[in-house]
């Protein structure tokens, strides 16, 4: 327990909360270039081949981002927009690629939950 004099000398520091998406530097989205597009397996008890991309952002960070939806057109040197949001069963993946912007096209034949996958309303 500190004395009153010690508290006067240097006050208590508030506990700073760490950001969950440091590479975005406080921005809602960031632009980046795909360095490598590949699949990876989730941790137990799940089993799949999750599509992810290694992205170099304009903020200088190099991150791993998840590619949501069924099928994609991304390859090396594709320019993508990245938002925050982790994938629970992929350790180290704390970002999502935004579908329907820049080089990432929307998901084909998607009818429900379209706004998340960059799909226009069908006629």
Curated annotation (Swiss-Prot):
Signal peptide: none annotated. The keyword Ribonucleoprotein applies. GO terms for biological process: translation. The keyword Chloroplast applies. Keywords: Chloroplast, Plastid, Ribonucleoprotein, Ribosomal protein, RNA-binding, rRNA-binding. SUPFAM superfamilies: Nucleic acid-binding proteins. PROSITE patterns: RIBOSOMAL_S12. Pfam families: Ribosom_S12_S23. GO terms for cellular component: chloroplast; small ribosomal subunit. InterPro entries: NA-bd_OB-fold, Ribosomal_uS12, Ribosomal_uS12_bac. One of its GO terms (molecular function) is structural constituent of ribosome. It comes from the Eukaryota. It is found in: Plastid, Chloroplast. NCBIfam families: rpsL_bact. HAMAP family: Ribosomal_uS12_B. Belongs to the universal ribosomal protein uS12 family. PANTHER family: 30S RIBOSOMAL PROTEIN S12 FAMILY MEMBER. With S4 and S5 plays an important role in translational accuracy. Located at the interface of the 30S and 50S subunits. Part of the 30S ribosomal subunit. This is Small ribosomal subunit protein uS12cz/uS12cy. It comes from Psilotum nudum. The gene is rps12-A.
């Amino acid at each position: 327990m500190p004395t009153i004099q010690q508290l006067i000398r240097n006050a208590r520091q508030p506990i700073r909360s760490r950001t969950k998406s440091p590479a975005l530097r406080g921005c809602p989205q960031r632009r980046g270039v795909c360095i490598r597009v590949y699949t990876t397996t989730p941790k137990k008890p799940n089993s799949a081949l999750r599509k992810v991309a290694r992205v170099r952002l304009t903020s200088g960070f190099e991150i791993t981002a998840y590619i949501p939806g069924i099928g994609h057109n991304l390859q090396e040197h594709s320019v993508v927009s990245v938002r925050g949001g982790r994938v629970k069963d992929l350790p180290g993946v704390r970002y999502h690629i935004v579908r329907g912007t820049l080089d990432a096209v929307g998901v084909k034949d998607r009818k429900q939950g379209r706004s998340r996958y960059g799909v226009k309303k069908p006629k």
